[in-house]
């Protein structure tokens, strides 16, 4: 599986613009009563073909099914890995800053050295509710955990400009 993903993302690397980025939503899982650290194993594979890991974001989900087969713990988050092709990559961080005057005032008073008039930078923990299966429309594949439209829009806003090309190698089946 990892070798297949490595090959896919190596091919994507060759057609990505120099300032391009890559977003992957991925999770750990259990096999033979042990956690498989798939996100971190994948990072190593992608580094070997040139991708540079820039951020690890936690998508805190509002609901899920039990993580283990016995229901010991619920997995309430997934990893969102943000890669770039080169060190100088496109980012529109000012477009996604949080500008809520009530939140901003509290934040600014507590951390005045971090004040930015354009708003507060995004946190590394994102909270987006999971859409109901089929909420993207009847023509879409029913995915076990569809990505929230708002989360996808945030990713696109961060890393693209109007008229840029966004490529989803898995055709909306669960990967961005």
PLM regions and their residue ranges:
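Core catalytic lobe of class I
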Residues: 1-176
């Amino acid at each position: 599986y990892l070798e297949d993903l490595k090959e896919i993302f190596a091919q994507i690397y060759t057609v990505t613009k120099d300032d391009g980025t890559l977003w992957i939503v991925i999770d750990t899982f259990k096999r033979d009563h042990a956690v498989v650290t798939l996100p971190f194993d994948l990072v190593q594979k992608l580094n070997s073909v040139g991708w540079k890991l820039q951020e690890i974001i936690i998508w805190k989900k509002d609901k899920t099914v039990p993580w283990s087969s016995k229901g010991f713990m619920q997995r309430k988050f997934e990893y969102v890995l943000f890669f770039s092709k080169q060190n100088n990559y496109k980012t529109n961080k000012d477009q996604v800053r949080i500008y809520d005057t009530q939140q901003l005032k509290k934040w600014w008073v507590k951390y005045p050295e971090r004040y930015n008039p354009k708003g507060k930078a995004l946190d590394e923990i994102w909270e987006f509710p999971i859409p109901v299966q089929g909420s993207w429309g009847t023509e879409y594949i029913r995915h076990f955990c569809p990505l929230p439209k708002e989360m996808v829009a945030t990713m696109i806003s961060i890393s693209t400009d109007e008229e840029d090309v966004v490529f989803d190698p898995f055709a909306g089946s669960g990967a961005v």
